[in-house]
């Protein structure tokens, strides 16, 4: 691969963006970045704390800056936060600076993959399924709008999905 390309993974919570992203980066010899981990690194606090102290709006401001910074790099795989897609600025940066891969999954899989994860502030409610359905209604059309490639992640291992992405991108 003479030209260093960026691959940006978008999709809902529990789609496997971070896990698949790590495999993809390793297989393609690219740097891996996770926007949520970068926010935690810069703030010295976990995402739940940022949400508690700054609210979702404060978190989204940080997320927009982190994604802007990371998408300036070359030769990376970036796992974005599930809600980052709602920012027009982030959508524009992702579309302009790399290949956008939408990791699609079902609500059932999201529930199964996230039910014990206390680090997801939006799901710390009585009915996380209802929240996930509501988020999907708003976000799924945005994922589809900017995706160069759509890959289903439901019944496959992260490594298999990473291989499918490589195949679809012709790398």
From Swiss-Prot:
Compartment annotation: Cytoplasm
Transmembrane segments: none
Pathway annotation from the record: Metabolic intermediate biosynthesis; chorismate biosynthesis; chorismate from D-erythrose 4-phosphate and phosphoenolpyruvate: step 5/7
Catalyses which reaction(s): shikimate + ATP = 3-phosphoshikimate + ADP + H(+)
Binding site for Mg(2+): 18
Single Gene Ontology BP annotation: aromatic amino acid family biosynthetic process
Cofactor note: Binds 1 Mg(2+) ion per subunit.
EC number: 2.7.1.71
Function: Catalyzes the specific phosphorylation of the 3-hydroxyl group of shikimic acid using ATP as a cosubstrate.
Name of the protein in its database record: Shikimate kinase
Organism listed in the record: Shewanella pealeana (strain ATCC 700345 / ANG-SQ1)
């Amino acid at each position: 691969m003479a030209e260093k390309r960026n691959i940006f993974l978008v999709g809902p919570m529990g789609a496997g963006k971070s896990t698949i992203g790590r495999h993809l980066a390793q297989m393609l010899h690219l740097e891996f970045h996770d926007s949520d981990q970068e926010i935690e690194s810069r703030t010295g606090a976990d995402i739940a704390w940022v949400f508690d102290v700054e609210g979702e709006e404060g978190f989204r401001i940080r997320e927009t800056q982190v994604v802007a910074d990371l998408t300036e790099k070359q030769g990376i795989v970036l796992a974005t936060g599930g809600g980052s897609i709602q920012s027009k600025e982030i959508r524009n940066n992702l579309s302009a600076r790399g290949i956008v891969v939408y990791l699609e999954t079902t609500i059932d899989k999201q529930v199964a993959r996230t039910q014990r994860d206390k680090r997801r502030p939006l799901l710390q409610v009585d009915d996380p399924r209802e929240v996930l359905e509501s988020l999907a209604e708003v976000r799924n059309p945005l994922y589809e709008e900017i995706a160069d490639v759509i890959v289903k992640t439901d019944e496959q291992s992260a490594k298999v999905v990473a291989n499918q992405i490589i195949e679809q991108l012709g790398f």
